[in-house]
Regions:
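C-terminal nucleotide
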Residues: 1-120
C-alpha cells in the first residue's frame, strides 16, 4: 500500500484536475479498502466494517453505475464518508437515510479556503 501511495496520489490529483470523477472514485475507494484489508489481515485482526458500512458502500457503487457521481471512503472505523457533487446531495442523503442501521447523516461541503490568522 505504501509503496504505491505516490502513484495513486498522482492519479487522484490528475483526476481532480481533469474533473474525472470516475477515476477519482476508483482510487479513493481502492485506497480505503486497502487500508482496511491491512487491518483485517493483521494479527490481531481489526474488523471495523459493519453490515451497515458494507450496505452503504454497495449503495454508493450502485449509484455510480447508474450515472450518479458518488464515491466512498472510510476512516479507521466503521464511518463511511460519501463524496458527491453538490447537485446530488439531497438524493444521496435520502437514500442513505433509508438504509437500516444508518444512525446519522452529516452533510458537509467545501469550505472557503485557508486563511492566515494573526496570533494575539
Amino acid at each position: 500500500r505504501l509503496k504505491d501511495a505516490a502513484r495513486r496520489l498522482e492519479i487522484c490529483r490528475n483526476a481532480l484536475k481533469n474533473r474525472d470523477f470516475e477515476t477519482f472514485a476508483e482510487i479513493i475507494e481502492i485506497d480505503s479498502n486497502m487500508m482496511h484489508a491491512i487491518m483485517m489481515t493483521s494479527n490481531p485482526s481489526i474488523m471495523y466494517w459493519q453490515p451497515t458500512s458494507i450496505k452503504i458502500m454497495q449503495t454508493v457503487r450502485a449509484l455510480r453505475q447508474k450515472g450518479t457521481a458518488a464515491a466512498f471512503t472510510l476512516d479507521a472505523g466503521s464511518n463511511v464518508h460519501v463524496i458527491c457533487e453538490g447537485n446530488t446531495v439531497n438524493k444521496i442523503e435520502a437514500l442513505l437515510r433509508e438504509i437500516s442501521g444508518v444512525k446519522e447523516v452529516i452533510k458537509s461541503s467545501v469550505g472557503s479556503g485557508a486563511k492566515f490568522v494573526e496570533s494575539a
